[in-house]
Swiss-Prot record:
The lineage of its organism: Eukaryota, Metazoa, Chordata, Craniata, Vertebrata. Heterotetramer of two alpha-D chains and two beta chains. InterPro entries: Globin, Globin-like_sf, Globin/Proto, Hemoglobin_a-typ, Hemoglobin_oxygen_transport, Hemoglobin_pi. Keywords: Heme, Iron, Metal-binding, Oxygen transport, Transport. Involved in oxygen transport from the lung to the various peripheral tissues. GO terms for molecular function: haptoglobin binding; heme binding; iron ion binding; organic acid binding; oxygen binding; oxygen carrier activity; peroxidase activity. It comes from Struthio camelus (Common ostrich). Gene3D superfamilies: Globins (1.10.490.10). This is Hemoglobin subunit alpha-D. GO terms for biological process: hydrogen peroxide catabolic process.
Amino acid sequence: MLTADDKKLIQQIWEKVGSHLEDFGAEALERMFITYPQTKTYFPHFDLHPGSEQIRGHGKKVANALGNAVKSLDNLSQALSELSNLHAYNLRVDPVNFKLLSQCFQVVLAVHMGKDYTPEVHAAYDKFLTAVAAVLAEKYR
């Protein structure tokens, strides 16, 4: 459960992400593909080289979806419903992969936010990304 303080920290950091959506999303995907190579199986049609247009494009989609979730912190299920349906019913992505990508996104934030990525921010984003992963996995039950 996100507290009012968590929500405030999440929104403050997300404002700083702003113009870096595509970069951060792509970097998170690249980190996931390197750290968890089994995740590449869901992208057989992608050029998986770092910086490829396909990774950058999908990274932007990921970051935009997270941005949408940040705007809807009080109703993540509704905000992510279509995305959950897509991944569960059409793409059939193993839901464990949402957690893996969340971890990689945390690393990207920590690297780029520097001293602004305090332990409190880390904890808030951990709760937020865990909630996002749980919502995306809801349709699998």
